């Protein structure tokens, strides 16, 4: 998204469980040290491949700097994903991994607004529908957090005008 600001060199990654048709899905999210959302990745399974895909997707944009530190919780999928990403050259070899739960508190709090909307919707019936809907939630959440270059954080009128302009809606 070319409307966003640049990011800092500390990245936090976490996953959240979303119920889809009585089964579960996992949505991986990455934020920087100032709680700006970098990217998210939906996955049917919680695995190292999904965590690696999030990392590759988050670092694919040249406007995102290579992180010096990646904070994650103690999930077993992250060390393998980070090791493979370093081997493939997606991630610098000097990047540190800090698997400490409390360092992800900002990200856990950031999940709250998305999870609140999911609970209000009473969960999803199909994975594709969940992916598209949560993608919309994430974009609106970015706009509300002030991550869009031309829209201030508390300016609701400007946020509405921006959404109307981007989606071509009548005002």
Question: Residue locations for each model-derived region?
Answer:
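Residue-level recognition of single "structural anchor" positions
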Residues: 1-171
């Amino acid at each position: 998204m070319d409307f966003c600001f640049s990011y800092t060199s500390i990245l936090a990654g976490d996953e959240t469980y979303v119920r889809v048709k009585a089964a579960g899905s996992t949505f991986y999210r990455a934020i920087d040290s100032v709680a700006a959302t970098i990217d998210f990745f939906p996955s049917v399974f919680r695995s190292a491949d999904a965590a690696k895909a999030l990392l590759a997707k988050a670092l694919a944009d040249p406007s995102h700097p290579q992180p010096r530190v990646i904070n994650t919780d103690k999930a077993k999928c992250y060390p393998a994903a980070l090791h493979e990403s370093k081997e493939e050259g997606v991630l610098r070899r000097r990047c540190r991994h800090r698997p400490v739960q409390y360092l992800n508190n900002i990200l856990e709090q950031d999940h709250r607004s998305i999870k609140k909307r999911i609970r209000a919707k009473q969960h999803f019936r199909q994975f594709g529908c969940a992916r598209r809907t949560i993608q919309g939630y994430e974009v609106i959440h970015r706009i509300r957090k002030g991550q869009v270059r031309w829209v201030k954080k508390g300016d609701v009128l400007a946020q509405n005008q921006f959404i109307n302009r981007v989606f071509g809606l009548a005002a």
